[in-house]
Amino acid sequence: MKKTELLYEGKAKKIWKTDDENILIAEFKDSLTAFDAQKKSEEAGKGALNCKISANLFKLLEEQGIKTHFVECISENEMVIKKAEMIMIEVVVRNIATGSLTKRLGIPDGTKLPFALVEFYYKNDALHDPLINDEHALILELVDHESELEELKRLGREINVVLKSFFDKANLNLVDFKVEFGKDSEGNIILADEISPDSCRFWDKTSGEKLDKDLFRHDLGNVKVAYEEVLKRITKVMQ
């Protein structure tokens, strides 16, 4: 498998074309960004940690019947993935109120929600990824049919059930997470991008300690140490 051309570079990853038109390579970067990339830093080894964490969680979800773009890891920070036409919607699933939800609705921080809340955000850097509803998504033609929005919600909730149960065994509360989806060569919606402490909030169930990118956002502690702890707990549960 050879990289042939840089297809896309985002805040956290580079996506490379390969000599197989249906296969790409995702290279996880060591960069850290927050607040629409107004805050930036580098953390050596962070890309490798996110690659390993994402690979483990993709495998877990595949075992539970949720299709993903994951094929295999080929280095510490490189993952072979199936090519997918990305849907420009970020699907956010919330179990505990924190972050923007508390600011928008005045729900006290740390409130357990009565059910998993699924939100859509328009993936658009220039507009700062605004919160949208189903009608917005249809008007913007982000999906072909309303049924695809229902599929995104269903998949978001299914992923939440699997991950919540898994992280419970790791003594972590899955507070919320962001996932992205794409369509494979046959038009099936599959989970893409990554699942890592960059895109999830994890709170220790005993101490309440944050083990995710909020440490960087709010200068609360060492990101690499936290990500290493998340990987350690994931590995232990999967053994």
UniProtKB/Swiss-Prot annotation:
<dbReference type="Pfam" id="PF01259">
    <property type="entry name" value="SAICAR_synt"/>
</dbReference>
<dbReference type="InterPro" id="IPR001636">
    <property type="entry name" value="SAICAR_synth"/>
</dbReference>
<keyword id="KW-0547">Nucleotide-binding</keyword>
<dbReference type="GO" id="GO:0005524">
    <property type="term" value="F:ATP binding"/>
</dbReference>
<protein>
    <recommendedName>
        <fullName>Phosphoribosylaminoimidazole-succinocarboxamide synthase</fullName>
        <ecNumber>6.3.2.6</ecNumber>
    </recommendedName>
</protein>
<dbReference type="GO" id="GO:0004639">
    <property type="term" value="F:phosphoribosylaminoimidazolesuccinocarboxamide synthase activity"/>
</dbReference>
<comment type="similarity">
    <text>Belongs to the SAICAR synthetase family.</text>
</comment>
<dbReference type="GO" id="GO:0006189">
    <property type="term" value="P:'de novo' IMP biosynthetic process"/>
</dbReference>
<keyword id="KW-0436">Ligase</keyword>
<dbReference type="InterPro" id="IPR050089">
    <property type="entry name" value="SAICAR_synthetase"/>
</dbReference>
<comment type="pathway">
    <text>Purine metabolism; IMP biosynthesis via de novo pathway; 5-amino-1-(5-phospho-D-ribosyl)imidazole-4-carboxamide from 5-amino-1-(5-phospho-D-ribosyl)imidazole-4-carboxylate: step 1/2.</text>
</comment>
<dbReference type="InterPro" id="IPR028923">
    <property type="entry name" value="SAICAR_synt/ADE2_N"/>
</dbReference>
<keyword id="KW-0658">Purine biosynthesis</keyword>
<dbReference type="InterPro" id="IPR033934">
    <property type="entry name" value="SAICAR_synt_PurC"/>
</dbReference>
<keyword id="KW-0067">ATP-binding</keyword>
<dbReference type="GO" id="GO:0009236">
    <property type="term" value="P:cobalamin biosynthetic process"/>
</dbReference>
